[in-house]
């Protein structure tokens, strides 16, 4: 019998499904990022993963998917909040590129994407990226290494039709990292 894995399953914590409200309309950027910060904090408080949250919305503010960081519980380096949100959104709409039919999508994230999630953003099919904390906040408060980005990373996204807005509720997002550190969160 082969010892090679031929299937993979990534799960979000049980508390997440009880937290999300599919009927709610997130009509502004602040409410969308606030959700991701709340998810990140719950993930830390419940000890179910790292201090990051992300969500995909339609342009009019309907929640399509949400994710939290599950790297350590899932033993999977790609189980970042943004990646989880992208994969779940793609599964829900049944398209590998969310916006390929002209519908517009937004990714809100509690922190600036690392190099992995930044790269995935080009192909995920989103039209707008909303960011809470900056990379320097993550690295200063958690000692995580977020990896290299192009010097003009925002310009690279915008050149491909992805609008970027950052520093949305930045202080609140930074608070999640402080709480993670306070609770002895593991660096990975």
Predicted segments — roles?
Residues 52-61:
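Short beta-strand scaffold segments in enzyme catalytic cores
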Residues 45-48:
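Short loop/turn motifs at secondary-structure junctions and domain boundaries
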Residues 36, 53, 85:
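Conserved hydrophobic/aromatic pocket- or pore-lining residues that grip, position, or stack substrates
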Residues 70-84, 88:
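A short, polar/charged loop-to-alpha-helix boundary motif
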Residues 1-43, 103, 120, 124-188:
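Zinc-dependent deaminase
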Residues 107-124:
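Short, thiol/selenol-centered motifs that function as redox-active sites or metal-ligating centers
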Residues 86-111:
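Mobile, glycine- and charge-enriched loop segments
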């Amino acid at each position: 019998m082969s010892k090679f894995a031929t299937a993979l399953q990534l799960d979000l914590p049980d508390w997440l499904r009880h937290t999300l409200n599919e009927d709610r309309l997130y009509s502004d950027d602040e409410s969308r990022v606030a959700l991701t910060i709340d998810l990140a904090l719950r993930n830390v408080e419940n000890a179910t993963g790292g201090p990051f949250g992300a969500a995909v919305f339609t342009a009019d503010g309907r929640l399509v998917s949400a994710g939290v960081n599950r790297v350590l519980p899932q033993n999977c380096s790609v189980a970042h909040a943004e990646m989880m949100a992208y994969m779940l959104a793609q599964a829900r709409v049944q398209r590998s590129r969310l916006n390929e039919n002209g519908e517009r999508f937004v990714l809100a994230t509690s922190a600036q994407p690392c190099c992995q999630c930044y790269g995935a953003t080009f192909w995920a099919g989103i039209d707008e990226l909303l960011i809470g904390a900056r990379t320097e906040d993550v690295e200063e408060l958690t000692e995580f290494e977020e990896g290299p980005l192009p010097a003009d990373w925002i310009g690279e996204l915008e050149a491909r039709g992805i609008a970027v807005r950052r520093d949305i509720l930045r202080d609140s997002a930074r608070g999640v990292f402080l709480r993670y550190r306070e609770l002895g969160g593991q660096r990975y």
